[in-house]
C-alpha cells in the first residue's frame, strides 16, 4: 500500500510517501525573519500555500498511484486543538484524495510525532499496546499516556506537562540569541556535532 502523508505544521511544510518504508521524504522550513522567534498563523498559512506545491511536485511528477492519503489536521487530538496552518495541508490532501478516488485519514501533528518516533526506533509494535511517551518539540513538553484507538492510531492522554517555558522554546530562544535561523534546533544540533572540545 502506497500512502502520501502531508503535514503543514507551524514551521515546516512536509510530504512523504510510505509503502512499508519511507520512499520519499520532502520538507521545507517556513521562512522566519532573522531575530524573530516565530510566525503569526496568517504568515504560516501564506507560506504553506506557496511551499506545499513545491514540496509535492517531485512526488506528483512521478505519476505513481497512491492507495491512501494521510494528513495532520490539528496540533493534538484534543477538543479545541486548532491552528489555521493545518487547513492548508487538509485542503490539498482532500483534493488529491478526491482526484485519485482513494481514502483519506486525518490525524494530529502529535500523533505523527509519536508514530515517527516509534518508526525510527524500530518499535512500531508499541502501537498495539499502552505506553508512556514524552513529546518534546517546539511549544510542547509533555508526558503522554498512549494507547491505540479503535482505528489503531496512537491516542494520547496528557499525563504531565511543563508549566513554564517549553524545552523547544528554550532551544529556540538560545539559538536566536546566538544569531541562528529560527527554528533553531537543527542549527544548534549542527553546532553541537561540530564541537570538538
Model-predicted regions and their roles:
Residues 1, 102-132:
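Conserved phosphate-binding catalytic cores of ATP/NTP-utilizing and phosphoryl-transfer enzymes
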Residues 5-6, 70-71, 104-109, 165:
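General beta-strand structural signal in soluble alpha/beta enzymes
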Residues 8-46, 151-159:
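Short glycine-rich, Thr/Ser-proximal phosphate-binding strand/loop in the N-terminal lobe
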Residues 8-9, 24-25, 127-129, 135-136, ...:
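A short helix-loop
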Residues 12, 72-77, 108-114, 140:
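Acidic, glycine-rich active-site loops and adjacent beta-strand->loop/helix elements
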Residues 13-19, 115, 133-135, 141-145:
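Short beta-strand scaffold segments in enzyme catalytic cores
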Residues 27, 40, 44-64:
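Conserved phosphate-binding loops in N-terminal lobes of ATP-dependent enzymes
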Residues 57-94, 98:
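Short beta-strand-loop/turn "lid" adjacent to the catalytic site in phosphate-handling enzymes
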Amino acid at each position: 500500500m502506497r500512502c502520501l502523508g502531508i503535514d503543514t505544521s507551524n514551521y515546516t511544510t512536509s510530504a512523504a510517501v510510505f509503502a512499508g518504508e519511507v520512499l520519499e521524504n520532502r520538507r521545507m522550513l517556513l521562512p522566519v525573519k532573522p531575530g524573530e522567534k516565530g510566525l503569526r498563523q496568517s504568515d504560516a498559512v501564506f507560506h504553506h500555500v506557496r511551499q506545499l506545491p513545491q514540496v509535492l511536485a517531485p512526488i506528483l511528477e512521478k505519476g505513481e498511484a497512491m492507495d491512501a492519503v494521510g494528513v495532520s489536521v490539528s496540533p493534538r487530538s484534543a477538543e479545541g486543538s486548532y491552528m489555521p496552518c493545518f487547513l492548508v495541508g487538509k485542503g490539498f490532501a482532500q483534493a488529491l484524495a478526491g482526484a485519485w478516488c482513494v481514502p483519506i485519514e486525518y490525524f494530529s501533528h502529535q500523533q505523527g510525532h509519536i508514530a515517527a518516533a516509534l518508526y525510527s526506533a524500530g518499535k512500531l509494535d508499541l502501537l498495539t499496546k499502552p505506553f508512556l511517551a514524552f513529546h518534546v518539540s517546539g511549544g510542547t513538553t509533555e508526558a503522554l499516556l498512549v494507547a491505540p484507538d479503535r482505528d489503531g492510531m496512537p491516542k494520547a492522554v496528557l499525563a504531565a506537562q511543563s508549566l513554564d517555558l517549553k524545552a523547544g522554546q528554550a532551544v529556540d530562544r538560545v539559538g536566536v540569541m546566538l544569531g541562528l535561523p529560527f527554528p533553531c534546533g537543527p542549527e544548534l544540533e549542527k553546532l553541537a556535532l561540530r564541537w570538538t572540545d
